[in-house]
């Protein structure tokens, strides 16, 4: 069994929605990124890659590569899963914490969990997503961006 941790941050930029966990959420800003900016799926991908000792998403999907410009992070997550399966691992469970002052995440968490479970080929009860604020402290508290911490447990397939 292996455990991996992932962390990602994206700052807010011009736009009217963000994508988190594959879910499009209306917001007064977008997220600045080379891909679609799905900070949740990026942190999960890093946790999974880390657990399998496969590096990080920057190694697999560099932001200097034009083929990943605007990339759908769900496609990237499914690619990560193939890499993990190729090393003889399967997902035991994943757990993520979204750190954001806004927008409110609670109405979207069930949909995020469902899409992540679908992409990782696991049951819904193997995926947890939660959200918190920093009580208006730090860059997330000032609504300058969003951060996500993620943990993944891999089991031998």
UniProtKB/Swiss-Prot annotation:
Cofactor details (free text): Binds 1 divalent metal cation per subunit.
Gene Ontology BP, a term: isopentenyl diphosphate biosynthetic process, methylerythritol 4-phosphate pathway
Group of enzyme by EC: lyase
E.C. numbers: 4.6.1.12
Matches recorded under InterPro entries: MECDP_synthase (IPR003526), MECDP_synthase_CS (IPR020555), MECDP_synthase_sf (IPR036571)
Physiological role: Involved in the biosynthesis of isopentenyl diphosphate (IPP) and dimethylallyl diphosphate (DMAPP), two major building blocks of isoprenoid compounds. Catalyzes the conversion of 4-diphosphocytidyl-2-C-methyl-D-erythritol 2-phosphate (CDP-ME2P) to 2-C-methyl-D-erythritol 2,4-cyclodiphosphate (ME-CPP) with a corresponding release of cytidine 5-monophosphate (CMP).
Protein name listed in UniProt: 2-C-methyl-D-erythritol 2,4-cyclodiphosphate synthase
Native source organism of the sequence: Pseudomonas syringae pv. tomato (strain ATCC BAA-871 / DC3000)
Gene (UniProt): ispF
């Amino acid at each position: 069994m292996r455990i991996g941790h992932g962390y990602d941050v994206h700052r807010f930029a011009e736009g009217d929605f963000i994508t988190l966990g594959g879910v499009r959420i209306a917001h007064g800003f977008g997220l600045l990124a080379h891909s679609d900016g799905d900070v949740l799926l990026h942190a999960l991908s890093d946790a999974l890659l880390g657990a399998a000792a496969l590096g990080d998403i920057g190694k697999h999907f560099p932001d200097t590569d034009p083929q990943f410009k605007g990339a759908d992070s769900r496609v990237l997550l499914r690619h990560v899963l193939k890499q993990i399966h190729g090393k003889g691992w399967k997902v035991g469970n994943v757990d993520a914490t979204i750190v954001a002052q806004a927008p409110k995440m609670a109405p979207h968490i069930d949909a995020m969990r469902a899409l992540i479970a679908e992409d990782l080929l696991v049951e819904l009860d193997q995926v947890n997503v939660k959200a918190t604020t920093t009580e208006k402290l730090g860059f997330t508290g000032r609504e300058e961006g969003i951060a996500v911490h993620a943990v993944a447990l891999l089991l031998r397939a």
